[in-house]
C-alpha cells in the first residue's frame, strides 16, 4: 500500500467520468478490496449529503442567461441580411440554408457555453446547475432547453427545420414555436419506438458473429503489431485518447529511450508506463491487438490485453467475443432511449475560425492559393498546402500557419482589425459527422420567361431532356410576364409612347400571351384564337401547330398568325392584297362553316416567287383508316415530283409533295397495327377473322378480313385486308392480274360465271406457301379531282376585276406517293390532298433578283369601325445580301428576332410596333400623311445575348446606293435588315470587389468573370420598303454613354457607402435589386432594361436566382415557367444530425459493408496497387499474400476509426479492442481467385486468411486470393458451425446444404453447445486440461518459417504507422 505522503489532495467538483478515472487509479494503487471499501465510504457520504441538502427543482431556479437578448438579436440581424442577399441573388438557397443553420447553431452553442459560468458566478448551489453536471440526472442539453434557447429542431426524417425556436421552456413558446417543437417531440417518440428495435437487433447480430471467440491460449507467438504515435506532422494527438488507446494493451516490441530499454515485449501497459512514454516523448509504440493474433477461431491473452473488469491480464476461458458484442450494442440501446428526453433538438458542428490577434496588414504568397466561393457564398481563397500568413503592425510581426484545404477570407495587403476572422478551417478535419449527398430543388416563385447567361451549357444533359448542366457560377433570371390561358391575339390601336407587349407563341407550351397597356385606356379588341372550342364563337381551330410552327436553331419562335375564316374578302390595288378578318362580334351573329384556310407568313414577312401563301385541307379528302394510295393504273407515269412545296430554306421541312396532273386517285383501305416484339398475338398468319376479334390482350379488330403478320426489326406489323378471297383454277391466268386495279364493267372472277363490276377493285395475289396461292379482291375508294379550283370559290369576284402583276394561283398536292402506305395515329384523320395558294408575279428582267413580296398585318379605323387586314405588297429589296449570309445550314432566314412588324393604320398616322427580343418595344410616331410611303421611327437595340451581329459582311453596294441618294446619311458599321440595331462598340465594366469593411456584404458578389457587355441604342427611320435611314444628324448625343452611380447596401445602416463608376445603361441589361441607377437612390427592384430614354429608363421586373457549378437547370432558354415549376436542382453534402439515432444506421452500414463510401471499393484499388508493386519486387508467390494482408490490416483500422467516430461524438467511450474483435471476424475471410489455379481450393471459395497462409506454406506454392469484406450477417452464415448458422437465419437452407455436403460440427462455439444442451466451453474456472497451452518449442519453428516475412516487417509497420497517424489527426 502506498504511503499517505505520496497521495495528492484534490479539491474540485468531479463528475461521472472523473469518478471512473478515480476508481481505475484506486484499483491500480490499492487493489480491489481496498477500492471497494473506499467506494462504500463515498456512497455513504453521497447519500448523507443528498439527504441533508434535499435538492428540489422549482420554476424560480430556472434563470435565463442575461446575454441571451443581444445574442438572439445579433443572430436575427445576420439572418435578415442573409435573406436580403438571397433576394438580391448573391447567395443561392443551399448557401442560405447552410449559413442560417450555422448562425443559429452558433448562437445556441454560445448560450450553452455561457450557462455554466453564469450559474457558477450568480448561484453556484442552484439545483438546476448541480443536477445537470452531476451526471446522475439530466444533462447540459436538457438544461440548455430550459434556461437557454430550444434552438433548431429536426423533423421525424432527421431533416433540419430552418426556423429556430428562440424561446426556452421557462419563457414559454409561441404558437409557431410550439408546432415546430411538436415535430421534434414526435421525432423523439418515433426514434424511441423504432430505433430501439434496430439497436437490439444490431446487438444480436454482433454477438452472433463473435460468440465463439474465447481466450484459449496465453501467447500465440505473433511478432506483428500496430504502431501508435502520440505525435504527427500537423498536431498532437489528444492525450486522453492516446492513454485510452494504450492502457490495457500488451507491447509487441521492446521500447527504447536512447540506448535504455524502458519496457519489454509482452509487457502489459499500465497508467504509470503510459505517462512515462508521454513524458519522454516516445515516437511510436508497437502494440499487440486482436488483429495480429495468429489463432484461427479464438484469441490469446497477450493479444487481448487486460480485462476491463479487474485490470489484470484476461483470464483463460473468458468469453471476450460476447463481451465485445454487448459493449458495442448496449450504448446504442441506451442512447436511443435517452434521445426521448432531448426531443429531437438538432446538433451539428461549427467551423473553426482563425482570428487576427491585433490590427495590421495581411501578407501571404498568392501563388499558393486560388479564388473560390465558400459554403456560404463568401469570396475566399483556398489553400493548396500549409500557408504562412504574416500580420504586420507598426512594431510587431506575427505569423500564422493555415492548414491545407482551408479558406482564407482576406486579400493580400488588406488591413484587418483585431479579432477579425481571417481564415476558416475546413469542416471535416475536426468533426466526426458523416456526410451524405442531398438534392435540393428550387422552385420558381413567379410566372415568367427564363433567361440565363452564356455560362449555362446550352446543350441538354441528355437527348430530348430539358436539363442543362451549369459549368460556372451564373445567374438565372425569371422575367415577369403572364401567359394568357385563352390564347388571345391582340390587334388594337395604340398611341404614341404606349408600352406594348407583342403576343409571342411558345412552341413548348402552345400558348399565346398578350398584354396591353394604353395611355388613355382605350377599349381593346381581341381576335379570338381559341385552341379547342369551335362551337361557341366559330373561332379558328389550332388543333395541330406542329405543321405550321417551326423553331430555328437558336430557339426563336415564329411570330406568325394563322386564321381560317369564311368571310375572306380580298381587295387588290397596285400590287397589293388586302385580306380582312372578322371580329368576334360579327362571328357570333352569323356562324358560317369554315373552309379551313391557314395563312402562313414567314418570320421575315418576305415571300419569294412561287411561295405558298396559304393552304387549306378539304374534308372530302380526309380518311380515318390506314391504307395505300394508287395513281390511276400502274402505267400512269404523269407524276411530277417536287422536292418541297416551300422553295426557300429555313422553315421546318414538310414531306415530299406530288403535284397532281391526274384527275383521279385511289385509296385501298387496310387496318394496320404495329405491335412490340414481345406482344402475344392471338391470331395466326393468313387466317380470316371477323369484326371485333381479339388480336392481342387489349386490341380488337375494327374490320374483318385476312390477317397478314410481318416481323420487322424490334416490332411486329399486323395488317387486316378486307375483301373477298378467290381460289383460281389452274386454267385461270390470274397471276398476270396480281397487284392491279380493275375498273368497273370488266373482270372475270370465274370462267363459268362472269358479271360486270360496279366499282373499282384491287386484285392482290397471296402465296402462303410455295405451292398454294389464292387471290384477294379488295375494295377501292375513288377520289376525283378537278383540274383547277377557281379562286372565285375562295374570294369574292371583285378581286379579279383589275388584272395586275401579283397573282394567286391554286395548286393541289397529294401528300403521299404512289403505292406508299398511309398510316394514322389512333383517333386522328389522314389528309390525302392539300390545296395551296401560291404567290406569283411577272418578273422584271432588269431587277429580277430585287423583287419580293412583303406581308403586313394592318388595322384600319374608319368612323369607329375597325377592321384587320393582311396586306401583301410587291416591293423592291435593296438588301440583296440576305441570302448570302454566313449562317448554319437550314437557316436562310434572317435570325434577328424582332423582324415581323405589326402595322396599324389610322387616317393620319402610321405606327409600327417593333418586337424586341423580350417581346417589348416603344412606339414612336412619325407623321407624314402627304406622301404614300410613310416612315416610322422606332427604338431598338442589341441584346447582351445577341447571336451574330453582321460584323463580317461587306455592304459596298448598299452603302453606295444610299450615299448617292442622300449624301448626308452615314451608316456606322453596317446596316442590317429591318429593325436590327447595329453594334457600335462594346463597353466592358467589371464590378469592383470592395474591401472597405470586412463585414460589408460586397464580399457576396464574387462571381466567375463578372462581366457585362453594354451596347448602345440607336434611332433609325424605316420606310415601307425596308430601307433604313438615320435622319438624326445629332444622333451621336444619344450614343454617348450615360454616367451613372451605383452602390450596394451594407450591413452598417448608418452610412451608405457609394462607389462612383462610369456605368453604361443599355437595353437588355440585367440589374440586381438595390443598385444605384440615378441620384444615389437605390433601385428597389431587380429587372432587365427595356427602354432607355434621355431622362428615364423602363425596366421589366425580373427575379434573379444564383446557381453554382454542378447545379442542373430545368427548362430551355426562353421557356415559359409557371409558379411552382422546378427551376434548379442543387446537389450538396450535408452532415447528418449528431444524434446517435442518426449515427446508428451508419454503424450498421459499416458493419454490414453497405457504406455509402464503401470500403470494399477502396480495397479493390489498394490490392491492385500492392500486387503490382510487390510482385515486381518479389515475384508471384509472395505478391498476393503480402498485398492482400496489408490491405486487410489497413481496412481493419479504417473500420475501427469509423465506428469510434459515431460513439465518441456522443461521449460514449468504447475500448478499441471490442470493436477490433468484431472487425477481425468480418475481415478474416478471403476469396480464392482464378489466377494461378490451386489444387486445394476452388475459385470463388471463401476461406480464412490464416488457413490460406498456412496451406500455402505447407504446399510451398502460391494460393491466389483477394481480400473481401463480409457483413456481420454474412459472416454469421459463413462459420465452422452449421448449427450456429441455422439458429440465426435461413434455417432450412443452411441445414439442407450442410446435409448435402456432409458437414461436421465440432461444437467449438458457445451457441451450438447451448442449442444441443451441452456444457458451455467457456468460463474462467474451466478445466485447465482442455485449454490449449502454449508450447515454447513452436516459437522457434515459427521464427524460422517467418524469417522471410521479416524482410517486410519494417515497411509494413511504416505503412500501418502512417495510417494510424492519419487516424490520429482526425480525432
From Swiss-Prot:
Belongs to the RNA polymerase beta' chain family. RpoC2 subfamily. It holds the Pfam family RNA_pol_Rpb1_5. The lineage of its organism: Eukaryota, Viridiplantae, Streptophyta, Embryophyta, Tracheophyta. It is an enzyme of class 2 (transferase). The keyword Transferase applies. It is found in: Plastid, Chloroplast. Its cofactor is Zn(2+). It comes from Arabis hirsuta (Hairy rock-cress). DNA-dependent RNA polymerase catalyzes the transcription of DNA into RNA using the four ribonucleoside triphosphates as substrates. SUPFAM superfamilies: beta and beta-prime subunits of DNA dependent RNA-polymerase (SSF64484). InterPro entries: DNA-dir_RpoC2_beta_pp (IPR012756), RNA_pol_beta''_euk (IPR050254), RNA_pol_Rpb1_3_sf (IPR042102), RNA_pol_Rpb1_4 (IPR007083), RNA_pol_Rpb1_5 (IPR007081), Rpb1_funnel_sf (IPR038120). One of its GO terms (molecular function) is DNA binding. Binds 1 Zn(2+) ion per subunit. Gene3D superfamilies: 1.10.132.30, 1.10.150.390, 1.10.1790.20, RNA polymerase Rpb1, domain 3. GO terms for biological process: DNA-templated transcription. Disulfide bonds: none annotated. This is DNA-directed RNA polymerase subunit beta''. Zn(2+) binds at residues 220, 293, 300, 303. In plastids the minimal PEP RNA polymerase catalytic core is composed of four subunits: alpha, beta, beta', and beta''. When a (nuclear-encoded) sigma factor is associated with the core the holoenzyme is formed, which can initiate transcription. It catalyses: RNA(n) + a ribonucleoside 5'-triphosphate = RNA(n+1) + diphosphate. Its EC number is 2.7.7.6. One of its GO terms (cellular component) is mitochondrion. Its main location: plastid. It comes from the Eukaryota. Keywords: Chloroplast, DNA-directed RNA polymerase, Metal-binding, Nucleotidyltransferase, Plastid, Transcription, Transferase, Zinc. CDD domains: RNAP_beta'_C.
